[in-house]
Amino acid sequence: MDHLPMPKFGPLAGLRVVFSGIEIAGPFAGQMFAEWGAEVIWIENVAWADTIRVQPNYPQLSRRNLHALSLNIFKDEGREAFLKLMETTDIFIEASKGPAFARRGITDEVLWQHNPKLVIAHLSGFGQYGTEEYTNLPAYNTIAQAFSGYLIQNGDVDQPMPAFPYTADYFSGLTATTAALAALHKARETGKGESIDIAMYEVMLRMGQYFMMDYFNGGEMCPRMTKGKDPYYAGCGLYKCADGYIVMELVGITQIEECFKDIGLAHLLGTPEIPEGTQLIHRIECPYGPLVEEKLDAWLAAHTIAEVKERFAELNIACAKVLTVPELESNPQYVARESITQWQTMDGRTCKGPNVMPKFKNNPGQIWRGMPSHGMDTAAILKNIGYSENDIQELVSKGLAKVED
């Protein structure tokens, strides 16, 4: 297979990934592949571009490094071109409502007829099968959070609250990435492709699993947080200092002992309620839990963030300032690791945002291209799979493809 023009880099160089999906969840999987060196083709509707394009800045991050193909993949010669593309594709990711592709005639079996080794990842809110009530419903971030039991665990004691921004979309996209790579490993070993059914609500069910296990195996459900503090453990969560907020985790024998000395509770160490060797203070079961919180709140309120960070570093207590977004790019850790970077958009502007992650030592990812325009690479992609100029123009004239103006 000849590849589209792009630099060779990253651990996934030589891999061809194609995705069909809008907004965040499915495309986030494509973004990860593209930043790790894969050749990633983004399929868009011919008549209507991906709705993410209406956003002023985010698409420049989420669609960088991609090749843009505008093709009607469900109709006539457009479908034929799509199936031809699948012959040279390693991973195909689609995000839609339930078994939408199968309903329109593009089943796993049809795809495998054209490429027996193809890895297919289906991403939807409720899965490819189940009950009629749910399977074909649309779903976004908050829907998946609400249906999974994840949302009800977040927020404050007074009201549940979704975790933002768009947590379920990103977790689901990462799940598609890792699952597809696992399936690809097996497909290359056996020569047989795989179909992966990723339900967003099941992804979030796993993300919310920690406290659910207490309910499933005893009937007790953890309460929600109070003003950002851990619902179970004292000294864990969000706290206010004299000049702003920190998060901390008071965990460990020595850490508790030294912290108690600082906040005036050393006399409680070694008592039946807080025996020697205590590693966590349960705010509910320990009768001194509320007192620990009261003393800690008072001590933190009397000290600046810098003072708290310095002292907690001495005591090996995990803690961090709650950074504002404007503080990120000047933070020395961000600067040292180049966590924020810049790249050029297709129209020559400079865009700033998060860098490629994680950092591969021997085969690093990179940003080589900004977001392509609607249909920008259609002609190049179709030529790559054997279409002539006349073939491409015929697809365009029939409204089955769009090329860059």
From Swiss-Prot:
Pfam family for this entry, one: CoA_transf_3
Pathway: Amine and polyamine metabolism; carnitine metabolism
Binding locations of CoA: K97, R104
Localization terms from the record: Cytoplasm
Keywords attached to this entry: Cytoplasm, Transferase
A Gene Ontology biological process term: carnitine metabolic process
GO CC list: cytoplasm
EC numbers for this chain: 2.8.3.21
Chain ranges passing through the membrane: none
Residues making up the signal peptide according to the UniProt record: none
GO terms for MF: L-carnitine CoA-transferase activity
Database matches in PANTHER family: L-CARNITINE COA-TRANSFERASE, SUCCINYL-COA--D-CITRAMALATE COA-TRANSFERASE
Family (UniProt): Belongs to the CoA-transferase III family. CaiB subfamily.
Protein name: L-carnitine CoA-transferase
Originating species: Escherichia coli O17:K52:H18 (strain UMN026 / ExPEC)
